[in-house]
């Protein structure tokens, strides 16, 4: 559960309505893999991830980034039940993929940076504060199965 004021929920929803999930999802996942290269080990089956350029142009990375942000967007519809919304993904990432739950926090941080880059002045400190709460809540929900 994420405790947002009505104004914060409106800010999050309004901005998300403008997000190009395909573009920003690919950018967010690509940035995660470039900035935190140890995360690449979970995506070795995606092909060449040996350089930043290879990551940034890898079709499988871009497609998976879109998938990730699509799921994130679904979570925004259920802010009062994030653990339930992400229960299956939490189980998958814990039991099958063995992803370090810290990576969820890192991806959330990268997503905030990508949103700021794309929305500039529209991504005010208040909007950032609301998104920081949301990405922390989503990361916590995805890590839930680990506890």
UniProtKB/Swiss-Prot annotation:
Heterotetramer of two delta chains and two alpha chains. It comes from the Eukaryota. Residues 3-147 form the Globin domain. InterPro entries: Globin, Globin-like_sf, Globin/Proto, Hemoglobin_b, Hemoglobin_oxygen_transport. Pfam families: Globin. Keywords: Heme, Iron, Metal-binding, Oxygen transport, Transport. Belongs to the globin family. Red blood cells. One of its GO terms (biological process) is hydrogen peroxide catabolic process. One of its GO terms (molecular function) is oxygen carrier activity. This is Hemoglobin subunit delta. Heme b binds at residues 64, 93. The keyword Heme applies. GO terms for cellular component: blood microparticle; haptoglobin-hemoglobin complex; hemoglobin complex.
């Amino acid at each position: 559960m994420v405790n947002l004021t009505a104004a914060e929920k409106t800010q999050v929803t309004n901005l998300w309505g403008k997000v190009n999930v395909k573009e920003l999802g690919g950018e967010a996942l690509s940035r995660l893999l470039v900035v935190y290269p140890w995360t690449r080990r979970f995506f070795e089956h995606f092909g060449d991830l040996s350089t930043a350029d290879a990551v940034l142009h890898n079709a499988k990375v871009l497609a998976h980034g879109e998938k990730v942000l699509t799921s994130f967007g679904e979570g925004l519809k259920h802010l009062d039940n994030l653990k339930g919304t992400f229960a299956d993904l939490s189980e998958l990432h814990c039991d099958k993929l063995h992803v370090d739950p810290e990576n969820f926090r890192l991806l959330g941080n990268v997503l905030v940076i990508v949103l700021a880059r794309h929305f500039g002045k529209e991504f005010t400190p208040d909007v950032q504060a609301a998104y920081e709460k949301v990405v922390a809540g989503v990361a916590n929900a995805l890590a839930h199965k680990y506890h």
